Amino acid sequence: MKMDADSSGTEHRDSRGSRSRSWREREHHGRTSERDSRKKEHKIPYFADEVREQDRIRSLRQRAHQSTRRTRSRSRSQSSDRGSRHRRHRQRSRSRNRSRSRSSERRRRQRSPHRYNPPPKIINYYVQVPPQDFYGMPGMRQSFGYQRLPRPPPFPPAPFRYRQRQPFMGAPRFGYRNAGRPPY
């Protein structure tokens, strides 16, 4: 059933038109009886929107009876969205089952026998991150691919390679991977 935010399903209550609605319902469909309107006057409505208010009253009225009386023909509020949704769902599933059983023999034969395909396994390797990279510790000078040099290289590189003037040097730039020393 199609519903807008405020329509509360009243206009198009059932997809099956005349069959599900009793003749009394069909007769009195649009109009509200005088008795209702007289009763309504001194009450303060719960919803400002009168369509929703009607619907609420109707469902309340229906809930009073619900326990005792179960009739074959559905009462007006019974065929409101809840009931019809259940009914429609049941019907849909039944028809789906029927069609499946019809087509299953054909399909079963042509498909290749079912192989067991496990989902791909995810393999974790744990790689050690040297501590000076991880929490930029004052690092060992490392030369990649070789053992670290047994003693420091013969003469240390000159501290400033710049010809004219050094760019502004504050705290050395700190990222996890490239830090020779921590940022302070």
From Swiss-Prot:
Basic and acidic residues bias: where? 1-39, 49-58
Q: Which Pfam families match?
A: Transformer
Q: Does the keyword Transport apply?
A: no
**Any one Gene Ontology cellular component term annotated for this protein:** nuclear speck
InterPro entries from the entry?
Tra
The places in or outside the cell where this protein is found are:
Nucleus speckle
Pro residues bias: start-end ranges? 150-159
Additional remark text: The sexual regulation of tra occurs through a mechanism of sex-specific alternative RNA splicing. The non-sex-specific RNA expressed in males is not translated.
Entry remark concerning the domains of this protein: RS domain directs localization of proteins to the speckled subnuclear compartment and the purpose of this localization is to allow colocalization and co-concentration of components of the splicing and splicing regulatory machinery to permit relatively high rates and/or efficiencies of reaction and interaction.
What's its job?
A: Member of the regulatory pathway controlling female somatic sexual differentiation, regulated by Sxl. Activates dsx female-specific splicing by promoting the formation of a splicing enhancer complex which consists of tra, tra2 and sr proteins.
> What is the name attached to this protein's record?
Female-specific protein transformer
The source organism is Drosophila simulans (Fruit fly)
Q: Give the gene that encodes this protein.
A: tra
